Amino acid sequence: GYFAFEVVKDAARDLSEGRIPAGIPDSILENVKMDREVNGDLWKADLGRVERGKGWANLFDIDVELVRVNGQVWTMQAPSGRFFEKNMRADVTNPRGTMTEGALLFHYRAPAASWEQKTNYLVFPKGFEASGDLGAFEAGYMTLIPGGIMEADKGATVKWFDREEKTQ
């Protein structure tokens, strides 16, 4: 009881003096849309809500489209994430989406994903699953490298489906 009272009292003092305590957002934005080019890739993001603090932002209702230089189009939806300004990194929870390249379409999902501007890599550190008409792919750890290259680690499985053409 006493400890909680002191924490609240300190936070109230900081706010009354115009200082925002660490971990508390200083601004909240809703329905944020961003377009950005990073190393030739085009990123479009729609964010339902952004809670911004000093050097960080909590992200909610994330919807991203990434058009890679090689023509691949990745979409990603995630319920929440966090952006860190110091190292220009974003982490998201439970991303899911699609990857298209020409007529090829795969749906994917993962427990987590992270992206760093310095490398422009999209990393799925807790596993990755994808499936489409051609087959299915699972990895314990997956990195999407610019150019559309996927590197799988910690065990990977690929299943190709038989696509026999049937004529009548």
Task: Describe the residue ranges of each PLM region.
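Mature-chain termini and adjacent capping regions
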Residues: 1-168
